[in-house]
Amino acid sequence: MPQSNRIILTDVDGVLLEWENHFTKWMLQKSYFDEHGNRYFPHKSIPDQQNKYEMAERFGVTKDEIRKHIREFNRSAWMGTQRPMLESQTWVKLLAAEGWTFIPITSQTSDIPAQQLRKRRLGELYGDKVFTNYLILGTGADKDSALAEFHGTGLYWVEDKPHNAVAGLKYGLKPILIDHAYNRDFEHPEVLRVNNWKDIHQILSGKK
């Protein structure tokens, strides 16, 4: 149980690190060789599906197939080159300087080397002492078990996926949803929607 209320529980992909464009780039360059030794690129993004949360719809493949690709991607060296979400570095570092601690809760992978790569990347971008007590779950796993550890604390919980944001309410947390095209059809009276970490800083500072 946390001893301080100056703790922010936060997702990573789509909140701290840019994931969807990074994954799309990886998918589009993924290639194979046919029986004649010719290289081909089988994956194409579907233009009118790019605002969907479900990646299977974006690429016109089955959910089982896309899950295999995501598992491979999330344990690849590409985890070491994810870019920070726009302007997130400025405001996360400022919050840390003001005494806030961040606990990442991310459904990245159960692969230990890939988890270490994620930790290193977050440290490179935001600082080695900003994050603590990493809770890294299997690829795509529900976060209820991790959130349950903070039941009744009233901590802020930053997410980009509506399902996970609402899950925080079950444990007495204060969900904040980072705005993305794929979650704009979601509304909930107890979930705060923000554009970026600047908005979050204003909320935590009592300015919004």
Task: Enumerate the predicted regions with their spans.
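Conserved Lys-Pro-Asp/Glu-containing loop-to-beta segment of HAD-superfamily phosphomonoesterases
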Residues: D142-G168
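Short acidic-hydrophobic, aromatic-tinged amphipathic segments that line or gate anion-handling sites
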Residues: Y134-T139, V191-D199
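Active-site neighborhood of HAD-like aspartate-dependent phosphohydrolases
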Residues: M1-K63
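A short, structured active-site edge motif that brings together acidic residues
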Residues: I103-S110, K119, L125-K143
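Conserved acidic residues
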Residues: R6, T132, L155, V191
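Short, basic/glycine-rich phosphate-binding loops at helix/coil junctions
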Residues: R58-R75, G99-F102, Y126-K129
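Substrate-recognition element of Asp-dependent hydrolases with the DxDx(T/V) motif
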Residues: W78-P84, S88-L122
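Acidic, Mg2+-coordinating phosphoryl-transfer loop and its flanking beta/alpha structural elements
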Residues: V158-N195
